[in-house]
Amino acid sequence: MADLKVTQIKSIIGTKQNQKDSLRTLGLKGIRQTVVREDNAQNRGLINVVRHLVTVEEV
């Protein structure tokens, strides 16, 4: 499977708690931080919750 490069592009101020938790689970702590995660159903679900706060690229 491919990897996904996830970059946070917007702030978590004013977001719901489940969205904040999803970003933390992905390992994102601030704007413009990038992490590489395995492309699997669990990570896709987390990304789907915060799709308006992040950009995703296949690596």
From Swiss-Prot:
The record lists the organism as: Rhodococcus erythropolis (strain PR4 / NBRC 100887)
Name-wise, this protein is Large ribosomal subunit protein uL30
The record's similarity note reads: Belongs to the universal ribosomal protein uL30 family.
InterPro entries to which the protein is assigned, alphabetical: Ribo_uL30_ferredoxin-like_sf, Ribosomal_uL30_bac-type, Ribosomal_uL30_CS, Ribosomal_uL30_ferredoxin-like
One Gene Ontology cellular component term attached to this UniProt record is: cytosolic large ribosomal subunit
Assembly and partners are described as: Part of the 50S ribosomal subunit.
PANTHER family named in the record: LARGE RIBOSOMAL SUBUNIT PROTEIN UL30M, MITOCHONDRIAL RIBOSOMAL PROTEIN L30
From the UniProt record, give one GO term of the biological process aspect.
translation
Record key words, sorted: Ribonucleoprotein, Ribosomal protein
Q: Pfam families of this UniProt entry?
A: Ribosomal_L30 (PF00327)
Q: Which gene encodes it?
A: rpmD
Q: Give any GO molecular function from the UniProt entry.
A: structural constituent of ribosome
